[in-house]
């Protein structure tokens, strides 16, 4: 009987009490998030996960400066366009920065074979050793190495040519068959570049090479091609009706590359022993270089952020937040900002 009376008293006390609010405190937050089912849901607390700002500059990455090509393209830099001479002393970099419309590329018109693949290969290179693969003064005693210049590659108002290639021409009225080889003893991949000249008429062919039926052969363990010059009149480009087609290969350590020709060879002068590095890359950007250091570089500018996501640019180099297309990305750390009231 006493137990029943106690229950009744408790029930009476509860119904006579004030209204009880069950839940959490609302606040003045205007944070909104999108959920799977709803958009613009107001919540009490949330944190931003998305970085949307940059400094608009090219910066060093972890203290290492980039290779800024300026008015030179990848082609102009690696072939040795004389207008890119200031870049030849650069041996290491954190990344390569190229402008969208570089003026100095292939100064003598022609086709650059597998150019995009070469860019891809160079994007993983963080340093190289530029060295004479075939020294100019001693490698070609039966050919002229000083007359192969052109107004298309002029430098300081004078006809010139690529600094990494040699245009071999006749000597004393003849162009003897040549055969030259190089063994890669660098213990690294070596990038070798060369060209094949295609004159615009048979008169130029005879005058420069003293042969009408020329060929160029290039052979290594992984490369084997024979080139035949195509003599034809073409529209003038940079004042030239002739063309030079450019080629390259990667030579593995201890491998041998052999060049044979009886004319029309644009011979390698300098080659590059490559060192690949994690985190290197190539970006195309109009941003200017600044005295700054960053962990993440984009074509728009550098990002210094600890946030996990960014929407600045999909192309990044370094330790970067993951790119997303979203304009807003927040993580909810609270609840809906709507009070819930129940009466008992």
UniProtKB/Swiss-Prot annotation:
Intracellular or extracellular location(s): Virion membrane; Host apical cell membrane
Region forming the signal peptide: 1-17
Claim: Lipoprotein is one of the keywords in the record: yes
Topology versus the membrane: Single-pass type I membrane protein
GO terms of molecular function: host cell surface receptor binding
InterPro entries on file: Capsid_hemagglutn, Hemagglutn_HA1_a/b_dom_sf, Hemagglutn_influenz_A, Hemagglutn_influenz_A/B
Alphabetical UniProt keywords: Clathrin- and caveolin-independent endocytosis of virus by host, Clathrin-mediated endocytosis of virus by host, Disulfide bond, Fusion of virus membrane with host endosomal membrane, Fusion of virus membrane with host membrane, Glycoprotein, Hemagglutinin, Host cell membrane, Host membrane, Host-virus interaction, Lipoprotein, Membrane, Palmitate, Signal, Transmembrane, Viral attachment to host cell, Viral envelope protein, Viral penetration into host cytoplasm, Virion, Virus endocytosis by host, Virus entry into host cell
Modification note: In natural infection, inactive HA is matured into HA1 and HA2 outside the cell by one or more trypsin-like, arginine-specific endoprotease secreted by the bronchial epithelial cells. One identified protease that may be involved in this process is secreted in lungs by club cells. Palmitoylated.
Disulfide cross-links: 59-292, 72-84, 107-153, 296-320
Sites where a glycan is attached: 27-28, 40, 71, 104, 142, 172, 286, 304
Cellular compartments per GO CC: host cell plasma membrane; membrane; viral envelope; virion membrane
Keyword Ubl conjugation: no
Pfam families listed in its UniProt record: Hemagglutinin (PF00509)
SUBUNIT field: Homotrimer of disulfide-linked HA1-HA2.
Similarity remark: Belongs to the influenza viruses hemagglutinin family.
Function: Binds to sialic acid-containing receptors on the cell surface, bringing about the attachment of the virus particle to the cell. This attachment induces virion internalization of about two third of the virus particles through clathrin-dependent endocytosis and about one third through a clathrin- and caveolin-independent pathway. Plays a major role in the determination of host range restriction and virulence. Class I viral fusion protein.
Something else known: Major glycoprotein, comprises over 80% of the envelope proteins present in virus particle.
Protein name: Hemagglutinin
Native organism: Influenza A virus (strain A/Taiwan/1/1986 H1N1)
Gene name in the database record: HA
């Amino acid at each position: 009987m006493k137990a029943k009376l106690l229950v009744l008293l408790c029930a009476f006390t509860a119904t006579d009490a004030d209204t009880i609010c069950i839940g959490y405190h609302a606040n003045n937050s205007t944070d909104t998030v999108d959920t799977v089912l709803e958009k613009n849901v107001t919540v009490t607390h949330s944190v931003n996960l998305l970085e949307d700002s940059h400094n608009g500059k090219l910066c060093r990455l972890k203290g290492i400066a980039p290779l800024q090509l300026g008015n030179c393209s990848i082609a102009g830099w690696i072939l040795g366009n004389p207008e890119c001479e200031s870049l030849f002393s650069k041996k290491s970099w954190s990344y390569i920065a190229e402008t969208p419309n570089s003026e100095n590329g292939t100064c003598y018109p022609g086709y650059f074979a597998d150019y995009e693949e070469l860019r891809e290969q160079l994007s993983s290179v963080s340093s190289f050793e530029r060295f004479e693969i075939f020294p100019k003064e001693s490698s070609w005693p039966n050919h002229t190495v000083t007359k192969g210049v052109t107004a298309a590659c002029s430098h300081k108002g004078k006809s010139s040519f690529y600094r990494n290639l040699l245009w071999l021409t006749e000597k004393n009225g003849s162009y003897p068959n040549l055969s030259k080889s190089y063994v890669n003893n660098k213990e690294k991949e070596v990038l070798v570049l060369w060209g094949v000249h295609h004159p615009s008429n048979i008169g130029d062919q005879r005058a420069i090479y003293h042969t009408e039926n020329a060929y160029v052969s290039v052979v290594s363990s992984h490369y084997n091609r024979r080139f035949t010059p195509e003599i034809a009149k073409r529209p003038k480009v940079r004042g030239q009706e002739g063309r030079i087609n450019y080629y390259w290969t990667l030579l593995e350590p201890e491998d041998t590359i052999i060049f044979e020709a009886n004319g029309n060879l644009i011979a390698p002068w300098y080659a590059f022993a490559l060192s690949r590095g994690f985190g290197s890359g190539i970006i195309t950007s109009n941003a200017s270089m600044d005295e700054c250091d960053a962990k993440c570089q984009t074509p728009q500018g550098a990002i210094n952020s600890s946030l996990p996501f960014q929407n600045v640019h999909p192309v990044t180099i370094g330790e970067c937040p993951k790119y997303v297309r979203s304009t807003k990305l927040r993580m909810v750390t609270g609840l809906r900002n709507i009070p819930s009231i129940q009466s008992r």
